[in-house]
Design a protein with these regions (language model features):
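Residues that cap or flank secondary-structure elements
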Residues: 71, 125, 145, 180-184, ...
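Catalytic-core regions built around general acid/base machinery
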Residues: 129-140
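N-terminal helical cap/lid subdomain that shapes the substrate entry/recognition surface
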Residues: 6-10, 15-26, 30-128
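Conserved SAM-binding loop
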Residues: 30, 68, 146, 205-206, ...
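Asp-based, Mg2+/Mn2+-dependent phosphohydrolase catalytic module
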Residues: 1-20, 135-136, 151-261
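Short, flexible loop segments at the rims of nucleotide/cofactor-binding pockets, characterized by
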Residues: 119-124, 147, 222-224
Length: 261
């Protein structure tokens, strides 16, 4: 039996004859909203941590913190991970807590408020090369889905002009409704594959967050592709990516598959 190639070393090819579906993360893979999320998180934590620094200059929230503790995770999981890392102790609170309340949920809701303000002010842009790749996947006969921890999936896809390119969606609203654990647990990806009617082993996962790459590997998906826009290729490969590319322009679709629809 041949050994599986080292993570991150497979040819940058999706063979439509091997797979039935491709599941995409949204922020950072399809849309240039990861930078908006980071900016909102930075505003939140730079203010919050400075407020709690007790006369000592607080260490700012940096991109490395975003990638390590927040990227790909739900808002509440991200807040709690950062607070734990900074040894800040707040009650969890409830999802109904108003933005800015001195609870983890209050901070999570404040982050959501900041993100929506930036989204309204700056708009949403899709990565053109990602749109080309999604269209190539569909032209090859593969089903497509979006998986995101965001509760604003429909608004973002609509604003980016991507709402008609996917057969299924699993987002933060679904996660709350159905009790799906966030990444790095594979629950949301597994739910997307189930909605498409395709087994995980016959499904490709495309992710930019290490937590999402790990979720794809833990879920037993047939191919896990990491998209490295932030210098995290090594971490993605270590997390389980079979292929790591800097942009989806580097990933080719070969072969054809009848979708049977």
């Amino acid at each position: 039996m041949n050994a599986r190639p080292a993570r991150g070393t497979l040819a940058a090819v999706v063979d439509a004859r091997r797979f039935g579906a491709v599941v995409f993360d949204m922020d950072g893979v399809l849309t240039d909203t990861a930078r908006v999320h980071f900016a909102a998180w930075k505003l939140l934590f730079d203010d919050e941590l400075a407020h709690r620094a007790s006369g000592v200059e607080a260490e700012p929230f940096e991109l490395e913190d975003y990638l390590r503790f927040v990227d790909g995770r739900s808002r509440i999981d991200g807040v709690e991970a950062v607070l734990d890392a900074r040894e800040v102790h707040l009650a969890t609170g409830a999802s109904s807590d108003p933005p800015g309340e001195a609870t983890a949920w209050g901070l999570a809701n404040r982050k959501d408020e900041l993100f929506l303000q930036a989204l309204k002010r700056d708009g949403v842009h899709a990565f053109a090369t990602s749109v080309v790749f999604v269209r190539a996947v569909r032209a090859a006969g593969l089903a497509t889905a979006v998986v995101t921890a965001s509760s604003h999936r429909s608004d973002v896809l609509l604003a980016a002009g991507l709402d008609g390119l996917f057969d299924a969606h699993v987002d933060g609203v679904d996660a709350a409704e159905f009790g799906l654990a966030g990444k790095p647990a594979p629950d949301m990806f597994l739910a997307a594959a189930a909605r498409l009617g395709v087994e995980p082993v016959s499904t490709v996962v495309v992710e930019d967050a290490v937590a999402g790459v790990t979720a794809g590997r833990r879920g037993g998906f047939g191919l896990v592709v990491g998209v490295d826009r932030t210098g995290s290729a090594s971490a993605q490969a270590a997390g389980g990516a079979d292929i790591v590319v800097g942009d989806l322009a580097e990933l080719r679709v070969v072969g054809l598959r009848s979708r049977g629809r």
